[in-house]
Amino acid sequence: MDNIKVLFLGDVYGKAGRKIISDHLPIIKKKYQLNLIIANAENTTNGKGLSWNHYQILKQAGIDYITMGNHTWFQKQDLELVLNQVDVIRPLNLMQDFNYFQLGKGSYLFSLNGLKIRITNLLGTSINLPFAITNPFVELKKLVLTKDCDLHIVDFHAETTSEKNAFCMVFDGYVTAILGTHTHVPSNDLRITPKGSVYITDVGMCGPGFGSVIGANPKQSIKLFCTGERQFFEVSNCGAQLNGVFFEVCSKTNQVVKIEQIRIVLDDEKYLANDYFNLVE
């Protein structure tokens, strides 16, 4: 039996994210002989949520399973349709009285090449949704104790590096992979932990390039930091980047035998043409 080869793609953000995945994923899949492709798609539609049309685009590009995050519930016109797809996994740790608790699932168990594989999506406590979420540490421990799978891949969608590091300390060796998402900035700490789990604080995003502020129009972000004025962030149209984590698992031992960070950056001249100095007053 061949080893399981997995690719996890960071937060898909807007048109740039959809396009770079559609253009490059077939090449990556062939190069790495992938068995399983997972992507966090919570920012796919205008930076917030996932529409039915964009769900179909990601599926056509070759993504097998989709995880979500704190923007899961923004595309309300398609919410029930998208979340009830068998391959879409929304955050697990929701309060039962949360409005959308009944839609979708937070963890999914399936078989691949004779192995039972579970994918789980969790929101960190550092995500400011106190009215909606339960503790991710407690919820994952409950799930781990069921011991119902050979491989367990966790998308931990959290704000702070400290919470993600603490999460890794708790679940090192109890799950196959802990893949941080949400901040859109790839961290430089991909590793196989002492007890054998894949860990990275943040995978990064698949979206606009360096001419954006984590995917958004820089003018609006700069204004927020200078004046405190909040407004809807437009998705930047400057360049593109793809960030992902590849890992290979031995099908005989269920141990991770190889990891690699995948990064493609396609920036353009729009970045050089912009000068934001005078936005500061």
From Swiss-Prot:
Gene3D superfamilies from the UniProt entry: 3.60.21.10
Coiled-coil boundaries: none
Cofactors named for this entry: Fe(3+)
SUPFAM superfamilies xref list: Metallo-dependent phosphatases
Spans traversing the lipid bilayer: none
Keyword NAD among record annotations: no
Superkingdom as given in the UniProt entry: Bacteria
Active site (UniProt): 71 (proton donor)
Keyword Nucleotide-binding part of the UniProt annotation: no
Residues the entry annotates as binding Fe cation 1: 11, 42-43, 184
A GO molecular function held by the record: 2',3'-cyclic-nucleotide 3'-phosphodiesterase activity
Entry keywords, A to Z: Hydrolase, Iron, Metal-binding
Positions of Fe cation 2 binding: 42, 70, 157, 182
A Pfam family the protein falls into: YmdB
InterPro entries for the chain: Metallo-depent_PP-like, YmdB-like
Enzyme Commission numbers on file: 3.1.-.-
NCBIfam families: TIGR00282 family metallophosphoesterase (TIGR00282)
Family designation: Belongs to the YmdB-like family.
Protein name: Putative phosphatase/phosphodiesterase MG246
